Regions:
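Catalytic-core segments of class I nucleotidyltransferases/pyrophosphorylases
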Residues: 9, 27-31, 59-140, 145-168
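Conserved beta-loop-beta/alpha segment of the NTase-like Rossmann-fold superfamily
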Residues: 1-58, 95-97, 103-106
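Short, mixed-charge aromatic SLiMs
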Residues: 17-22, 121-128, 145, 173-178
Length: 182
């Protein structure tokens, strides 16, 4: 980052977050509260082992219809019984420039890799403000075919130009499939 820059946006390419617009909400939170702002989704307790999980506390601040919480800590891929919540990190981050120093100071974590979650946790422990925007939309995991294919369909159906034709084609494909497998 240059001298006048103090934030970096990170958008992981294997997460499709719908509908669009969560980054704009995150910018609003950062402008109002400072620090780093992350996107969170609620998952079931059984799913938490796949994610970085937030330990959060409520804020008594209104953000025009979207939920914001203060992050007290993060745990990378905990067993369900040890998860502090069911709010998980979802590939959208506005990180204060301090993240670069934190990344230099952490050691490899889960899987023998440097984990962004560990660097964020270090910043939290050192008093850096971190908040989450709880996104009420959908998240698709593009990192495997089981998530990639439905994500493309979902995204395509929402497209103003291609959505109606895709919807019609999918109805026909489903009807043909059901007839073939009946």
């Amino acid at each position: 980052l240059g001298d006048g820059e103090d934030v970096v946006a990170v958008m992981l390419p294997d997460d499709l977050v719908l509908p669009a617009g969560v980054m704009e909400k995150m910018v609003q939170v950062r402008e109002r509260l400072g620090g780093s702002v992350l996107c969170a989704f609620n998952v079931t307790r059984e799913e938490v082992f796949n994610y970085g999980v937030f330990d959060v506390e409520e804020l008594d601040i209104d953000f025009d219809g979207f939920e914001v919480k203060r992050v007290r800590g993060m745990v990378e891929k905990p067993v369900p019984e040890e998860a502090p919540s069911t709010l998980v990190a979802t590939g959208r981050y506005l990180l204060d420039r301090g993240i670069f120093d934190a990344l230099r100071r952490i050691t490899p974590g889960k899987g023998g890799e440097l984990q962004l979650t560990d660097a964020i946790e270090l910043m939290i422990q050192e008093g850096h403000p971190v908040h989450v925007v709880v996104h009420e939309g959908k998240r698709h995991d593009l990192g495997n075919p089981g998530g990639y294919i439905p994500a493309n369909v979902d995204f395509g159906l929402r497209h103003p130009k291609y959505g109606p034709a895709l919807y019609t084609a999918l109805k026909q494909i489903m009807a043909d499939f059901e007839a073939e497998t009946a």
